[in-house]
Amino acid sequence: MSRRGTAEKKTAKSDPIYRNRLVNMLVNRILKHGKKSLAYQIIYRAVKKIQQKTETNPLSVLRQAIRGVTPNITVKARRVGGSTHQVPIEIGSTQGKALAVRWLLAASRKRPGRDMAFKLSSELVDAAKGSGDAIRKKEETLRMAEANRAFAHFR
């Protein structure tokens, strides 16, 4: 048994303009080579583009997109008796949000075009509507978990 105490949960900080933790999560995940100011520029331009496209509150579109992509169950590879099984496990809201942000950014990067702000805004609007690559990824994960439900007792 470990003698160390359990680590305290760190709360995510909010971004300077919108005072929103989800925006800060996006900024920290989009970050490359330590260029945080560039990451902020990309996110803020994407938020402006969402405002222009939907003519609604862009933060509510962002929340709706992340809520739509967030999974509540995922699969984890588990080795049992020489064979590897995909075992479905339930995940918490924090881990689910982190996965959702990761999937949204991956789907945005895959989209055609040069401007990341445009690609991200398009993906967020699509995800809020219930379509797009990130939603497809969530559905695929849920299908995988449902198919491997028989291995749930390996948890």
Curated annotation (Swiss-Prot):
The entry's family comment says: Belongs to the universal ribosomal protein uS7 family.
Q: Which domain of life is it from?
A: Eukaryota
Where the protein is mainly located, per its record?
plastid
Q: What PROSITE patterns does the record point to?
A: RIBOSOMAL_S7
Task: Kindly list the GO CC terms recorded for this protein.
Answer: chloroplast; small ribosomal subunit
Location(s) in or outside the cell:
Plastid, Chloroplast
Against Pfam families, the record matches this protein to: Ribosomal_S7
Q: Could you tell me what this protein is called? A: Small ribosomal subunit protein uS7cz/uS7cy
* UniProt-listed GO biological process terms: translation
* Xref: CDD domains: uS7_Chloroplast
Organism source for this protein?
Answer: Ipomoea purpurea
Query: Which terms in the Gene Ontology molecular function aspect does this entry carry?
Result: rRNA binding; structural constituent of ribosome
This molecule's function is given as: One of the primary rRNA binding proteins, it binds directly to 16S rRNA where it nucleates assembly of the head domain of the 30S subunit.
Quaternary assembly = Part of the 30S ribosomal subunit.
Keywords from UniProt, A to Z, are:
Chloroplast, Plastid, Ribonucleoprotein, Ribosomal protein, RNA-binding, rRNA-binding
